[in-house]
């Protein structure tokens, strides 16, 4: 699904790639491989186009820049498969964890689950966007710290549906 977003005179093509069926099999061994391969393939294809001597004036960017990783609000911790997949994905793309269907939780349940997830991310050394980077200057570190605080404190709405049409209701999800 593609959509053009324009804000402050800047046009951006937003491409949404869904991965239906991920982790739904009886044997989920290496179920993340097709996702990671797709992300890497998109980056490689863009780089090949960029490095050609006679490159096109406009190269459509099909790279995956961000992964919204929806975590089921089970009331427990992350599933073992989620931990493995988050590690694999964070090596190739910016990962933003989102609590799926969080509007079905009370404020207290949502906060407790969010804290549990943050603890698990720290325990398993999972990377969450924005990343800490030794090469950043002080201003960039401060900006990244503020982004991280905003992501953890605020509750921005995220539209989540299989299709953004009038036939599918859009549920609210909260970071």
Identify the role of each PLM range.
Residues 1-96, 101, 106-147, 161-171, ...:
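Switch- and interface-adjacent substructures of P-loop NTPase systems
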Residues 148-154:
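Short, disulfide-bonded extracellular cysteine-rich repeat modules
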């Amino acid at each position: 699904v593609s959509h053009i977003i324009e804000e402050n005179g800047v046009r951006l093509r937003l491409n949404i790639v869904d991965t239906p069926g991920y982790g739904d099999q009886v044997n989920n061994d290496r179920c993340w491989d097709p996702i990671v391969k797709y992300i890497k393939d998109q980056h490689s294809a863009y780089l090949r186009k960029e490095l050609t001597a006679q490159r096109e004036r406009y190269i459509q960017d099909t790279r995956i820049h961000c992964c919204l990783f929806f975590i089921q609000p089970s009331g427990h911790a992350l599933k073992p498969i989620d931990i493995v997949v988050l590690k694999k994905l964070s090596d190739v793309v910016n990962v933003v964890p989102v609590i799926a269907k969080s509007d079905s939780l009370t404020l207290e349940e949502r906060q407790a689950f969010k804290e549990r997830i943050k603890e698990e991310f720290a325990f398993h050394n999972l990377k969450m966007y924005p990343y800490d980077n030794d090469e950043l200057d002080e201003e960039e570190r401060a900006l990244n710290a503020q982004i991280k605080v905003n992501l953890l404190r605020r509750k921005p709405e995220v539209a989540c549906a299989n299709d953004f049409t009038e036939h599918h209701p859009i549920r609210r999800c909260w970071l």
